[in-house]
Structure formats: structure tokens, C-alpha cells
A protein has these predicted regions:
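Short catalytic/ligand-binding loop motif for oxyanion handling, primarily in non-cytosolic enzymes
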Residues: 31-34, 80, 87-88
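Active-site-proximal beta-strand/loop segments in catalytic clefts of secreted hydrolases
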Residues: 25-29, 62-63, 81
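Active-site-proximal segments of metallohydrolase catalytic domains
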Residues: 1-45
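Active-site recognition of the HExxH zinc-binding catalytic motif
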Residues: 65-86
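Arginine residue identity/basic-tract feature
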Residues: 15-16, 36, 40, 52, ...
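Active-site scaffold of zinc-dependent metalloenzymes
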Residues: 32-33, 37-64
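Hydrophobic beta-strand segments of well-ordered beta-sheets in folded domains
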Residues: 20-24, 56-58, 99
Length: 173
């Protein structure tokens, strides 16, 4: 996908005050990234940043041949990029204790959503970015229903509440 042409054709720079972000749905091989940040000071957002003369915004690219689980995964990769940039220490700890978008806390394999191995996780350590209980608790895929979409929802739901503004309001990232 030619991002410059897309931005020009839809006058996204001139109309920047009319939207918070842009979502594109397309088919396979349309060539867009899952997420890309555009603006004066964009960061890597699961794709190379694209510097343009406007406040930052994100273009999300979704494939209509894929499911809601994959759309949530694309969004979760955006979350990973933004949090790794803004809160690197906290986010590394979160990933070690809760898991990454691809790898739940109770496995070492990508996409192993139905793993019933019990393991310790500490999701509730991060409501204010400070550990309060180093023990955590034992759990497995039953936490998210042992499905991909369940894991994406669970992973996003366990993020600290005070990071959502950073994730969604990227104009000043």
C-alpha cells in the first residue's frame, strides 16, 4: 500500500482534527501494516514510523478474511509498541509476568492459547506500576477460556488502567 497516496487521496493531513485514528479493512496482499503511526514525531508502532506535518495518529489495517481475534492481535501489537516506547521497564516486567501478545505466561510457544500447564502470573501487580505481592497466583488457559480471542481480551484487560490514555491518544507520544 502506498501510504503517501492514501494520506493524500483522503486528505488526512488537512482533515487531522476530524478523527483520532484511521481503520482500514482490506483483503490479503493489500500491503498495509497492522498498525502504523504517522505524524510529526511518530514512533515504531508495529511498522516503521512515517513523518508527516500533523499531530500523530495511527492507521490500523485489518484483513476482512481474518477474524476478530486477529484484529485484536493487530491492536495488541500496537499496544506493545507504544508501551515498550513509553514505559520500557514496566512493560518488560508486565510481559515477563503476564505474557506477550503471542506467548501466554504459562508457555514458551507462540499461539499456545490452549495450554493447560499451571504457572504463576502477577497481573494484579500493575494497577499503579508498583509490585504489592511478589507471589502472584497459579493459573492456566482457563483464565481466558483457552482460545485466541479469549487470550487477546484477557491480555488487554490485564493492562494497567492508567496506560490506556497513552495507547489511544498518540498525538503526543
Amino acid at each position: 500500500m502506498n501510504y503517501d497516496k492514501f494520506i493524500q487521496d483522503f486528505h488526512l493531513i488537512e482533515r487531522r482534527g476530524e478523527y483520532d485514528e484511521v481503520h482500514i479493512w482490506g483483503g490479503p496482499y493489500f500491503g498495509f501494516y497492522e498498525s502504523r503511526m504517522i505524524g510529526r514525531n511518530p514512533i515504531f508502532c508495529n511498522a516503521p514510523p512515517l513523518v508527516r506535518p500533523c499531530n500523530n495518529f495511527v492507521i490500523m489495517g485489518f484483513n476482512y478474511e481474518r477474524g476478530i481475534s486477529e484484529a485484536l492481535e493487530a491492536f495488541a501489537h500496537r499496544v506493545e509498541s507504544i508501551l515498550a516506547h513509553n514505559y520500557p521497564t514496566m512493560f518488560r516486567a508486565y510481559q515477563r509476568q503476564v505474557g506477550t501478545v503471542h506467548i501466554p505466561f504459562n508457555t514458551t510457544k507462540d499461539y499456545d492459547w490452549s495450554n493447560e500447564t499451571m504457572a504463576r502470573y502477577r497481573n494484579y501487580l500493575f494497577p499503579n506500576f508498583t509490585p504489592t505481592n511478589l507471589l502472584g497466583r497459579m493459573a492456566n488457559c482457563q483464565e481466558w477460556g483457552c482460545t485466541g480471542i479469549g487470550y487477546m481480551q484477557w491480555w488487554l484487560r490485564n493492562l494497567p488502567k492508567n496506560v490506556w490514555k497513552t495507547i489511544l491518544e498518540v498525538k503526543n507520544v
